[in-house]
C-alpha cells in the first residue's frame, strides 16, 4: 500500500553539523508523520564524496532513493533538518493539488537577485524569471510524475558540476536552490503551486519576529531556522521543540 512520505536529509559532515540539534527537528517530524499517517524517511549516509556533490543536491535523488529502498509512495514532502513542525499543523498533502509545491523565498533578496543574474548568464543561456517567483527549497512537495523532472536536474549536474562550483566559488551565490528554481520556472511553471508562508517561516531574524517568547510559533506551521539565526540553529530547534511538544 502506498503512503505519503516525509523525507529529511541529515548527513553529518563535521562537528558543526553534528551539534546543530537536528535530532529535535526529526523528533517533531516523527510526531507529524504519525498524526497524518505518513512514513518518515531520514537519509543519514552520503551518496557521493563531498568533493563532488554536497548533500543539498541529494534532494534531486529522493524519488530514486525511495524506489531503490522499495518504498511505495504517493506524495513526498521534503523538509530541511533545521525545521520544526507545529503539532497543530494540518495535513499538507491535502492542499497540493498533486503539483510541485514550494514556498516563496522571503528575505535575502540581494542574494536571490545575484543568484538569478549569475546563473542565468553562466548556466541557463540568459533565461530569467521574476525574483518574486523564487522559492526556498527547504520545504517542497512532489510526487511520482516529477521523476523525469528531477532526472533532468541530475543530468544537468553531472554535465555542469564544474561550472556550478565555479559560479558558487566566484560569485558567492546559492547552491542547489537556484538551479532547482530555474528548472521549475522554465520547465514546469504550470505544475508549480505556491504555498503560504506559514508552511515555511524562513528568515525569521531579518523579519524581526524571532524572540524568546516564541510568539512566532503561533502564526505558522513550520519554523525554519535558516539564514544565520543567532546564537545557533540548534539553540532554536531545541527551544522550539520543547516549547511546542514538552510544555
Which residues does each PLM region occupy?
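Charged, low-complexity C-terminal accessory regions
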Residues: 82-94, 219, 224-247
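N-terminal anchoring/stem segment of glycosyltransferases
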Residues: 1-61, 65-73, 189, 226-229, ...
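Short, flexible, basic/aromatic active-site loop/helix in glycosyltransferases
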Residues: 117-131, 148
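Conserved beta-strand termini and adjacent loop/short-helix elements that scaffold enzyme active sites
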Residues: 9, 43-45, 103, 195-198
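A short acidic, often aromatic-flanked loop/helix-cap motif at beta-alpha or helix-coil junctions
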Residues: 46-51, 108-110, 200-205, 230-231
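GT-A fold catalytic core of metal-dependent nucleotide-sugar glycosyltransferases
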Residues: 55-117, 141-142, 146, 150
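Short, polar loop motifs at secondary-structure junctions
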Residues: 26-27, 85-90, 198-200
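Catalytic core and acceptor-binding pocket of nucleotide-sugar-dependent glycosyltransferases
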Residues: 132-235
Amino acid at each position: 500500500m502506498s503512503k505519503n512520505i516525509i523525507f529529511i536529509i541529515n548527513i553529518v559532515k563535521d562537528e558543526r553539523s553534528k551539534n546543530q540539534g537536528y535530532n529535535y527537528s526529526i523528533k517533531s517530524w516523527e510526531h507529524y508523520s504519525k498524526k497524518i499517517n505518513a512514513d518518515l524517511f531520514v537519509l543519514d549516509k552520503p551518496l557521493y564524496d563531498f568533493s563532488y556533490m554536497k548533500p543539498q543536491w541529494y534532494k534531486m535523488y529522493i524519488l530514486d532513493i525511495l524506489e531503490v529502498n522499495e518504498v511505495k509512495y504517493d506524495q513526498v514532502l521534503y523538509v530541511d533538518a533545521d525545521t520544526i513542525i507545529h503539532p497543530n499543523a494540518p495535513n499538507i498533502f491535502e492542499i497540493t493539488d498533486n503539483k510541485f509545491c514550494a514556498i516563496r523565498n522571503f528575505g535575502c533578496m540581494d542574494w536571490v537577485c545575484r543568484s538569478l543574474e549569475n546563473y542565468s548568464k553562466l548556466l541557463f543561456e540568459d533565461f530569467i524569471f521574476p525574483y518574486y517567483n523564487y522559492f526556498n527549497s527547504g520545504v517542497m512537495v512532489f510526487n511520482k510524475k516529477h521523476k523525469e523532472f528531477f532526472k533532468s536536474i541530475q543530468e544537468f549536474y553531472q554535465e555542469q558540476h564544474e561550472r556550478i562550483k565555479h559560479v558558487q566559488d566566484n560569485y558567492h551565490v546559492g547552491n542547489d536552490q537556484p538551479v532547482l528554481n530555474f528548472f521549475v520556472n522554465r520547465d514546469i511553471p504550470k505544475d508549480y503551486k505556491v504555498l503560504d508562508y506559514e508552511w515555511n517561516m524562513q528568515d525569521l531574524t531579518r523579519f524581526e519576529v524571532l524572540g524568546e517568547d516564541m510568539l512566532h510559533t503561533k502564526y505558522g506551521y513550520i519554523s525554519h531556522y535558516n539564514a544565520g539565526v543567532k546564537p545557533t540553529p540548534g539553540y532554536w530547534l531545541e527551544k522550539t521543540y520543547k516549547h511546542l511538544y514538552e510544555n
